A protein has these predicted regions:
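Ankyrin repeat start-site detector
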Residues: 22, 55-56, 88-89, 121-122
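N-terminal segments that cap or nucleate solenoid repeat domains
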Residues: 11-59
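Ankyrin-repeat-protein effector appendages
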Residues: 1-27, 112, 119-147
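Conserved ankyrin/ankyrin-like repeat signature
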Residues: 38, 71-72, 104-105, 136-137
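Ankyrin repeat domain, specifically the short helix-to-loop turn at the C-terminus of the second helix
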Residues: 43-48, 74-81, 107-114, 142-147
């Protein structure tokens, strides 16, 4: 005896449900992935606002700094991201660049006038979050202190 499976139409094989994520979730994912084209599209289409503090407790620029992607940071700044925006713990993007050892991003933020003496809710300045092994950041802040 031979088994013949019931024929199913292509329509019944398609999922009847689809998952849709909120724009902010998709936007932050594009930032983390460094997908500059999609990040730009979201901003130009006004699907997101750059001053929002998301469920992660951070803004878009904070997320870009954490990803270590300077080009994404530059793109967000180009579209108006605030380089002094604070996350829920009072950290600025410069705090994050120093804490996560991204000297190229810290240098860029400082070149735009980011405040190096601003303190977070724990009273820490960005330079106090630098790992002493990150010589480039240590040197960057030691030369900036003399300015």
């Amino acid at each position: 005896m031979r088994y013949y499976p019931a024929r199913r139409s292509a329509r019944s094989l398609r999922s009847t449900r689809s998952v849709r994520f909120p724009n902010d979730v998709v936007f932050l994912d594009h930032i983390r992935q460094g997908d500059l084209e999609q990040v730009g599209r979201f901003i130009r289409a006004r699907k997101v606002t750059l001053d929002t503090i998301y469920l992660t407790g951070m803004g878009a620029l904070h997320e870009a700094v954490l990803s270590g992607n300077l080009e994404c940071v530059k793109l967000l700044v180009k579209y108006g991201a605030d380089i002094e925006q604070r996350d829920e713990n009072g950290w600025t993007p410069l705090h994050m660049a120093c804490s996560d050892a991204h000297p190229h991003i810290a240098r860029y933020l400082l070149s735009l006038g980011a405040q190096k003496d601003v303190v977070n809710t724990d009273g820490e300045k960005p330079c106090e979050l630098i790992d002493s092994d990150c010589e480039e950041l240590v040197q960057l802040f030691s030369t900036k202190e003399g300015d």
